[in-house]
């Protein structure tokens, strides 16, 4: 007996008896630890473990294991957590204090106040011209997507000590503004009446 199957979408293959965790990222923190069991946890995308406060010894003692295409681990947690993933998982080790931003990011003063100076961005980054002084404050920047910035900021951008990104795109210059008709000096010999000009 033969059968045909048409799949409209994508197919995800996961290990037998795994606990399927939905979402684009799963954070391993002390809240996760409260409910953790001696099970294999699987996610289609990635696990994040960047909070140094996570009690990794307690997590490992519960018999947890994890499986996903990628895992982002801060350096201090990696020695204990890395063995809990299979060899097929790509392990990305980041410095302690790194904030993982799960969206596009515009580098502004408020963004640095919120996330700090060590950033791992799962998306694109835009650096406006007015943020030139902020680049010197960035210690680590990893961007999975593109970076858009003015050409004059390129040297300061590449001076970031720990830098990794995709394509760098320069902002297109704005087209010169055309003078408005209202801004033109009126001709003293011309009178405008309801849209019609009469030359005297």
Language model segments and positions:
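Short, T/G/N/S-enriched strand-turn elements that build extracellular solenoid repeat scaffolds
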Residues: 1-24, 30-41, 53-65, 77-93, ...
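Long terminal segments
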Residues: 32, 164-200
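Terminal non-domain segments
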Residues: 41-61, 66-78, 82-84, 184-200
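Intrinsically disordered, low-complexity regulatory/activation regions of eukaryotic proteins
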Residues: 73, 90, 180-182
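Extracellular beta-strand repeat scaffolds in secreted/surface proteins
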Residues: 73, 147-149
């Amino acid at each position: 007996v033969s059968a045909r199957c048409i799949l409209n979408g994508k197919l995800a293959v996961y290990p037998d008896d795994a606990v399927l965790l939905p979402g684009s990222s799963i954070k391993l923190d002390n809240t996760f630890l409260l409910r953790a069991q001696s099970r294999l946890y699987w996610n289609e995308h990635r696990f994040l473990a960047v909070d140094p406060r996570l009690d990794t010894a307690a997590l490992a003692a519960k018999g947890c294991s994890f499986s996903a295409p990628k895992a982002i681990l801060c350096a201090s947690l990696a020695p204990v957590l890395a063995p809990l993933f299979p060899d097929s998982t790509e392990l990305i080790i980041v410095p302690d204090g790194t904030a993982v931003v799960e969206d596009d990011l515009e580098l502004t003063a408020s963004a640095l106040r919120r996330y700090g100076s060590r950033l791992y961005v799962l998306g694109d980054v835009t650096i406006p011209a007015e943020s030139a002084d902020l680049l010197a404050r960035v210690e680590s920047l990893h961007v999975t997507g593109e970076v858009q910035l003015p050409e004059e900021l390129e040297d300061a951008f590449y001076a970031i000590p720990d830098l990794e990104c995709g394509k760098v795109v320069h902002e297109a210059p704005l087209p010169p503004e055309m003078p408005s008709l209202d801004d033109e000096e009126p001709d003293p010999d011309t009178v405008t009446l309801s849209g019609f000009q009469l030359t005297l």
